C-alpha cells in the first residue's frame, strides 16, 4: 500500500549491486545506525515508487532504495524518476550511489575501487527529467566535496587500491558489452556500468550533490582473455558489508559539513520560458 507522506531526509542512498546482498544498512555493526521505517512505497507522477528504507546515522536521516529502483515491469527511466522525485519531496541534498562495474582501462583489476569525476552517457535513456524547468550545467557533475568524503571513508574501511578520479561510461544493458564496444571505450573511459545516467542528471535537477562508489567486479571483454563469474559472485556476497560501512561512514562524516560546492548553483532557470513557463503536473 502506498504511503502518502514522504519523510524528510538529508541523504539519499541509491543502492546497487554492491549492497544488494547485505540488506543495507540493517546488518551493519554500527551502534548509531537505526532503522526508522521500512518498505515505504509512495505514489509518484511516474507510478508507484520502489520500496524505500528510512534510517538514521546518528542524528542524520537518510532514505535508501535497492538496485537503483529497478524492477520488473518498470522502465529504468521511470524507476530513476520515481527515486529522485521521492528524494526531491524529502528535501534530500546529498545523494550517494554505488554499483559493481566492468573495466575499460587495462590497468584496473577486480576489487579495485574507483570514485569517478566524470562520465560518458552512451545510454538511450535520453530526455529523462522531472519537469524540465532547469538548465543543467554538468561541470563537476560528481560533487568534489562528496567524492572527497567517499574517498576518506573508503580508505578507512578498505586496504586495497582506490582511485579518486576516472571516467564512467554508461551503457544501457542489461547485457554486458561486446569486445568491440569495450575496444571503442578504451582510452575514453576507465569503467563501464549502467546506472550513473540518468541519476547524475536528476540529482542536479533536484539541486542535490551526487557522487558514486564503484567496485570493479569484472574485466571488460577483450581487456583480459577471460574473467571469472565465480569471482564476481564472491565479490557481491563477501564484500557487500564493507561497502555498506563505507556509505554509512560517508554519511556520518559529511553530515556536519556545510556545502561549499557549486552543485546547486549549476542548476539554472531555463531560458526556454515559452516552453517551460510553469511547473508541470509532474513537478
Model-derived regions, located:
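His/Asp/Glu-rich mid-to-C-terminal helical/loop segments that flank catalytic regions of hydrolases
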Residues: 221-272
Amino acid at each position: 500500500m502506498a504511503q502518502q507522506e514522504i519523510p524528510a531526509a538529508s541523504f539519499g542512498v541509491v543502492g546497487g549491486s554492491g549492497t544488494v546482498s547485505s540488506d543495507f544498512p540493517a546488518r551493519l555493526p554500527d551502534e548509531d545506525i537505526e532503522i526508522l521505517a521500512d518498505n515505504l512505497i509512495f505514489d509518484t507522477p511516474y507510478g508507484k515508487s520502489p520500496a524505500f528504507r528510512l534510517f538514521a546515522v546518528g542524528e542524520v536521516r537518510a532514505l535508501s532504495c535497492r538496485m537503483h529502483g529497478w524492477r520488473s515491469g518498470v522502465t529504468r527511466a521511470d524507476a530513476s524518476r520515481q527515486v529522485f522525485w521521492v528524494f526531491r519531496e524529502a528535501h534530500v541534498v546529498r545523494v550517494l550511489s554505488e554499483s559493481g562495474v566492468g573495466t575499460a582501462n587495462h590497468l584496473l583489476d577486480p576489487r579495485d575501487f574507483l570514485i569517478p569525476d566524470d562520465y560518458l552517457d552512451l545510454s538511450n535513456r535520453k530526455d529523462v527529467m522531472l519537469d524540465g524547468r532547469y538548465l543543467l550545467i554538468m561541470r563537476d557533475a560528481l560533487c568534489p566535496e562528496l567524492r572527497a568524503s567517499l574517498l576518506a571513508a573508503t580508505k578507512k574501511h578498505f586496504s586495497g587500491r582506490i582511485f579518486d578520479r576516472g571516467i564512467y561510461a554508461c551503457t544501457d544493458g542489461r547485457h554486458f558489452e561486446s569486445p568491440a564496444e569495450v575496444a571503442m571505450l578504451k582510452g575514453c573511459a576507465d569503467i563501464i556500468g549502467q546506472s550513473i545516467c540518468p541519476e547524475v542528471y536528476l540529482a542536479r535537477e533536484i539541486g542535490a550533490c551526487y557522487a558514486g562508489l564503484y567496485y570493479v567486479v569484472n574485466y571488460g571483454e577483450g581487456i583480459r582473455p577471460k574473467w571469472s563469474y565465480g569471482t564476481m559472485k564472491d565479490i557481491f556476497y563477501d564484500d557487500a558489508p564493507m561497502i555498506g560501512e563505507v556509505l554509512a561512514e560517508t554519511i556520518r562524516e559529511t553530515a556536519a559539513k556545510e556545502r561549499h560546492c557549486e552543485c546547486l548553483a549549476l542548476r539554472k532557470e531555463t531560458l526556454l520560458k515559452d516552453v517551460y513557463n510553469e511547473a508541470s503536473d509532474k513537478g
